[in-house]
Amino acid sequence: SENIEAIEFLKRVNEIVHSEHAGAITVAEESTTFAGVTKPVAEGGLGFDFKWNLGWMHDTLDYLKEDPINRKYHHNKMTFPSMFQFTEKFMLVYSHDEVVHGKSPMVGKMGSGYWDDKIATLRALYAYMWMWPGKKTLFMGDEIAQGHEWRYDESLEWSLLKYIQHEGVRRVVSDAAKLYLEDPKLA
């Protein structure tokens, strides 16, 4: 069942934000199949500008956690998100939720193998992410392949950039972001 009061509240919040703060965006972290999250309120939607594509995030991570030799049996995890890609205005996201509480840093999610293999897979993931339609966001430290989970009371491991593998991840993210800004088809 739907909570009608909550739905109306979200619609009203989005109407107020958009009418009183030109250029502001609202983003929904919403993992159900509730339709119309990013549809305008005037058209019966909730009026959010974007919705996190949590399905894409979970499917890609599930695929990349597989041992590389077994990934051929799981290609559907990489293709399934295209089935609903244009049902909402999605934002691809790897958030803080994915790099805390024993879940490991992003590089630790890249299947089995040597560290260099994991770093290469992470670079491939970020290139794939930036070439997939929609807006993107990474959590701090993801762009340098931070070696440990996020710790709110510590700085990022900027010293990792002296290593070519970590600098390579940073460069892929930077180059992909530049391409994204230059080519509207990627947005």
Give the residues covered by each predicted segment:
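Active-site beta-strand/loop architecture of penicillin-binding DD-peptidases
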Residues: L156
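Conserved alpha/beta catalytic core and glycan-binding cleft of carbohydrate-active enzymes
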Residues: E2-Y152, L160, L181-L186
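Catalytic cores of secreted or luminal carbohydrate-active enzymes
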Residues: I164-L186
